[in-house]
Amino acid sequence: MQMIGGEMWTAAGRRLHQQRDLHAILRTAHRRCCTRPIGGGLDAPAAPPGDLRTLSGVGMLIHQFKALLAPKKIYPWRSSHLQSLEVRRLHTAPSNAAAAAAVTDGGDQDKTKSAKDDDGDDKVQCKKEKIVTATKKGAAVLDQYIPDNIKTAYHVLQVGDEIYDATMNQTNVGGNNNKFYIIQALESDAGGNFMVYSRWGRVGTRDIHWSYRKGSHCYAHKYTWLEMDYGEADKETNKKTSSITNQLEETKLETRTASFISLICDISMMKQQMVEIGYNADKLPLGKLSKSTILKGYDVLKRISNVISGADTDRTQLEQLTGEFYSVIPHDFGFKKMSEFIIDTPQKLKAKLEMVEALSEIEIAIKLLEDDSSDQDHPLYARYKQFCCDFTPLEVDSEEYSMIKTYLTNTHGKTHTGYTVDIVQIFKVSRLGEMERFQKFASAGNRMLLWHGSRLTNWAGILSQGLRIAPPEAPISGFMFGKGVYFADMFSKSANYCCASEACKSGVMLLCEVALGEMNELLYGDFGADNLPNGKLSTKGVGQTEPNIAESKITDDGMVIPLGKPEKVPSRRGSLMYNEYIVYNVDQIRMRYILNVNFNFKRWG
C-alpha cells in the first residue's frame, strides 16, 4: 500500500483518570484487534488520507496510536460517527521529498542534480533551507503539517510519563527504501476530544511494539523508533540563538570575543553544515537529538567496522547494517539509489564517524543554548560564562601573535595547495581547571605546542567540556592510532579537519600545550596503539616530512614550538606524510590559543 500525506482519527469521550481503567480498555481493544482485522479482510482497502474517524475514547485512541506505530496495512477503527472535517492541507502543503512523492520498493528515478568534488565523488546538492515555525503545547512539538485550526485547539497526549509522539525511520539499502513515519495522539485543550494524526512517506511492517520502543534494535524492513529529547522547544532555542546573533552591540563582552562566541553558537550554521554532509535535520531536528540516539549511531558503525575489517566481507550484512545506521541517523539522499551509499570502505566509515562526532558536539551545544539559568544576563555573555574559559584577544603587533602567524605560515604543507588561510583573530585561552590537571604531567618532559582542528559545529561542545576521547561505542578502526586526542605539528594537516567549504569559509583551530613524555613512535597505523608500552605517555605517528627541529622555539618554561619550515626526512619510509601526536589522557592537554581563520579556496581552471 502506498500513500501520500497524512491521516487523522478523532475520539470523543472523557479521559479516564484511573490507570487500571485505561489498561482494561487497552486489553479489550487488543483482543478485538487480534481476533479479526479491523474494517474487513486482509485485502480490504484502507481509508484515503485525510479521513477523520470517531473513536470511543482515550483507550481506543491509544490503541489506534500503537497500531499505527508499526503498520503493515492500516485498517482504521470503524465507527458510525464519521466526521466531515477534511485535511486537504496535508496533501497540498510543501513537504520533504519523502512526504511529497510516492516511493516504490524498486529503484527510484534520480531527480536531483549532483556536483563532483575534487576526487570525483558525487555530492548531494545542498537545498536552500526553509524555516518552519514549530508549535509546542504540552510535552512535544505538534507536527508542522497539522492544520492550524487543530494546532490551536489540541496538544500531544501525555499519560503519566508516556508522551504519545513517535518519529520513525526505515532504511533498506537493498530495496532502495528510505522512509519515515510520524504519528501523534492529540487531546483537545478543553479535554474530552482526541485525535490520532500520522504522516509518512511509505507504510512499513508490524512487529515493534510501543512498550519496547526504547530498547528495540533495528530490524530489516522494520521502522526504527527515533528517541526525541523533550527538553526546551526548538522555538526557544532559535529565539536565544537569534538574540545571540543580532545583539552583539549590547553585550558587555569585548567586541572580538562577542563575535567569536556568536560564530560558534550559531544553530543555523550547525544545521546547514550537517545538511551539507547528508544529515536530515527535518526528520530528526538537531534540537531534539538525544544522547542515546547518538550512541546507537556509534554502535552501528562499530558493527560495520567489524564486518569491513573481517577476512570475508559480507556484502549483504553491510547493506543491512548500513540501512540500520541510516534508520538511526536519518539522511537525505533525495531520489538517488540507496546502493550508492552503502558504508563499505574504511573511508566511508570514517566520514560517518565524523558526522556522529559532530552530532554529539551539537547535542552538547543545544543543551547549552537551552540552559536558562543565566537568563538575567545578555545571551552572549551567558554563553561565554558556560564555556568556563577566559578569552584574551591578541593584538596584531604582539610577540605572541607574530610567533603564531609564523608557525601557521611555515607549517602549511606543500601537499595542501587547495587553499590559503587568513587569520581573523587569535585569542589566548585558559579553561577552568585545566592547568591544575595538567600540572601532574608538567614534569614528564617533552611538552610541545601543537595544532588541533575540528568542524565549526563542534567548538561550543569542545570549549564547554574540553577535548574528549571517543566513547566505547565508537569503532576503533575509525582512529588510526586508537581512541585518543590527535594533534599535528603541521598547521594544514589539522586545518583539513575544519572541513571548511565555499559555503562556509570560517574555521577554528586550537594550539594546545601537550605533555607527550616518552613517545611510542610508529611508522604505520595501529588501532591498538592506545595500549601503550610501559613507560610511554603518548604515540607519535612518524611522518616523512616535519618542521625543521633546529628552527624550533623553546619558551622560558621549556615548551617546544616546532615552527620551523618543513623538511623531508629521507630515512623515513612509513605510511604518513606528516607527523601525528596522540595522547590517551585528556589531563595531558592544556589549551593555550584559539584561532578564528578564513579559508580561501583556489579555483582550478
Swiss-Prot record:
Example of a GO MF term: NAD+ poly-ADP-ribosyltransferase activity
Domain of life per record: Eukaryota
Disulfide bonds: none
Positions of region (Disordered): 96-122
Broad class of where this protein is predominantly found: nucleus
Cellular component, GO annotation: nucleolus
Compartments where located: Nucleus
Keyword set includes Lipoprotein: no
InterPro entries, per the entry: ARTD/PARP, Poly(ADP-ribose)pol_cat_dom, Poly(ADP-ribose)pol_reg_dom, Poly(ADP-ribose)pol_reg_dom_sf, WGR_dom_sf, WGR_domain
Ranges of Basic and acidic residues composition bias in the record: 108-122
WGR domain: residues covered: 153-260
Reactions accelerated catalytically: NAD(+) + (ADP-D-ribosyl)n-acceptor = nicotinamide + (ADP-D-ribosyl)n+1-acceptor + H(+); L-aspartyl-[protein] + NAD(+) = 4-O-(ADP-D-ribosyl)-L-aspartyl-[protein] + nicotinamide; L-glutamyl-[protein] + NAD(+) = 5-O-(ADP-D-ribosyl)-L-glutamyl-[protein] + nicotinamide
Residue ranges occupied by any PARP catalytic domain in the UniProt entry: 378-605
Swiss-Prot/TrEMBL keywords: ADP-ribosylation, Glycosyltransferase, NAD, Nucleotidyltransferase, Nucleus, Transferase
EC number(s) reported in the record: 2.4.2.30, 2.4.2.-
GO biological process, one term: double-strand break repair
Domain (PARP alpha-helical) ranges: 250-370
SMART domains linked to this entry: WGR
Family: Belongs to the ARTD/PARP family.
Protein purpose: Involved in the base excision repair (BER) pathway, by catalyzing the poly(ADP-ribosyl)ation of a limited number of acceptor proteins involved in chromatin architecture and in DNA metabolism. This modification follows DNA damages and appears as an obligatory step in a detection/signaling pathway leading to the reparation of DNA strand breaks.
Name of the protein: Poly [ADP-ribose] polymerase 2-B
Species of origin: Oryza sativa subsp. japonica (Rice)
